[in-house]
Amino acid sequence: MKKKATTKRHKQNKYFENDSDENFYYIAGYTDGGAPYGITREEIIAQELKFRGAVKKDARKAAELIHIAIADIAEKLTGQTKKENIRETMANFFREENNRLSYQNMIVADLLGEVVGIVIIYPGEVASRLDEPILKQLRKKRRNEVIFLDKEADEGDFYIDTVCVDDRFRGRGIGTMLLKEAEKAASQKGYSRLSLNVAQDNPIAKKLYESIGCKKDKVIKINEHPYDYMVKIL
């Protein structure tokens, strides 16, 4: 049966199940009889994946991905312990300006209007200032004026705070592409060093960072855990 061509009809649909290779299908068009036909996730990524600055309406998904990426650090930043409260607090910070978690500091990977990956970036020299609104809320919540956050970034570095890809889309190069977007932003702003932290018990992530040219510079502690501070010279 001849397929009828359609334009920009790509969208997820429950009609298509994951096949044996775990390739989710998207609607690409419809046959003359009205049945949908699809294309694989890899094909749709190649055709439709875009990178853009985050906007406030991305808050819910952004908070979810940040939480997945930073795990227990999210509890320290928010002063919350329940998942829903952690994500709500982070989403609120995301919608605001001039803080570490703000939409202003994020690039998202957008696939057909859905956020499938994020990277948070900012200059190391503004890290302390970006933490101030978070610390203010933490100190008020805990009634403790001596709460501090660990220093994560060196001055003079363009810092990758967080990178995360939706688990449905991992293994398809999106993480690497997000890191390249961060590198591009650093170069455009005149920075010669790109830096990030990776937990020492996360060799898979470290291998990814090494693949784009990052090298271990030193070891620091974040939330009492050891991290390798990695740097790429641009």
Predicted region positions:
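Conserved beta-strand in the GNAT
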Residues: 108, 114-123, 159, 164
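Conserved N-terminal entry element of GNAT/NAT acetyltransferase domains
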Residues: 46-57, 77
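A short helix-loop-beta-strand connector motif used in the catalytic cores of GNAT acetyltransferases and
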Residues: 95-108, 125-129, 159
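Conserved acyl-donor/pantetheine-binding loop and adjacent beta-alpha core of acyl/acetyltransferases
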Residues: 123-158, 162
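Conserved GNAT-fold acetyl-CoA-binding loop/helix
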Residues: 71-94, 105, 139-140
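Helix-loop element at the rim of GNAT/NAT acetyltransferase active sites that forms part
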Residues: 53, 63-81, 97-99
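Conserved acetyl-CoA-binding loop-helix of GNAT-fold acetyltransferases
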Residues: 165, 171-188, 207-211
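C-terminal "cap" of GNAT-fold acetyltransferases
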Residues: 139, 192-206, 210-213, 218-234
